[in-house]
Amino acid sequence: MLQRIKNLRKPKVETLNTINISRENIINNIKLIKSLKPDSWIFPVLKSNAYGHGILQILDILKEEKFPYIVVDSFPEYQIIHNNSNFKILIMWETLPENYRYFDYSRTSVAIYNLSTLNYLISLNKRIKIQLFLNTWMNREGIQEKDLERFLTLLKNNPKISLDWVMSHLYDADVEENHINLQIANFKKMYSIIEEYWFKPRWRHIGASAGICSIDDTFFNAWRPWLILYWYSPFSEEKELLKKLKPALSLTSSVISLQKLSPQDWVSYNHRWIADKDCWSATIPFWYYEWWLRNLAWKLTYYYHWKQLEQIWTICMNLSCCIADSNMKIWDKIELIGNDINKKNSIAIIAEQANTIPYEILIRLDRGIRRIVY
């Protein structure tokens, strides 16, 4: 309550750049995900600042729904969720041992794949819920089959540590010729060893966004949607199942300068762009500090209302330019990223122009840009 009063007293400072998050579209995506797995539990993934959408903003939307757990990957993200909601939290990746002293284990379950971490948790002498992260041949992290019984023996001898989950991660579920069935077979083989020790974990999960669309196996009773929560498909080709997803993020900037140009006038560094007719250029305060990669120069399309604007000249650290519309005024808004998949400033198109993937575009959006849920 005190914090709310303090916030009311703060001056409302408007920002030049704003990321807008559609509550309606996120809710739409949640409903679609639940419809794909109606008999399973859904654990939304908010790691990497909710893929650039903002943890607090997405958290505010998710409060309208019921989920057993919210998934994050780090201690700092755990703190944000814990301090701003009543959700239970699943930590997907390990942290430094000394940090485990600070978790609220009444609301937290942690992933384990190192014996040293498990031994440290045992030394805390607390009741702690854990999940065993199995290595089903991705070989990035996880418990190998040859080591599994050492973990199980420790758990059997230390009943304060409760095995509630078993999980793994798919390494090529987003391609047509994949090894999903091989990984599932490995998972089930290791799970049978867990059962031999008389453990009955509540949840079994191996699939994230691609797995939700690719696996139809009732053995798994939980799923971890990440990209598709925000609309972005993990597949290179569009899946019929995902056509009803809606992008939730758009980004606008503000015109801070308008310059009238004559033929042969140039713009910014090194005379890289020269006008071939009378025109105006508009400058906006957004470039590679805020995220845009330098290799996107000359490739982007901005929108002023529904009119396309060509981005021009080599970029600066905090500024970029485009051809201005004749009706444009100082402080007018320009849309840099749109949430319409058919427009040239969609995340998918920008990622293609940058020769990267949509995730990288999203997670690199500067955390300092104000994010607003509408």
Where are these regions (language model features)?
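Active-site-proximal beta-alpha core segment in soluble small-molecule metabolic enzymes
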Residues: 4, 13, 17-21, 25-27, ...
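Short secondary-structure boundary/capping segments within folded domains
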Residues: 34-36, 51, 275
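Glycine-rich phosphate/diphosphate-binding loops that line cofactor/substrate pockets in enzymes
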Residues: 30-40
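Active-site anion/phosphate-binding pocket segments in diverse small-molecule metabolic enzymes
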Residues: 2-23, 27, 76, 95-97, ...
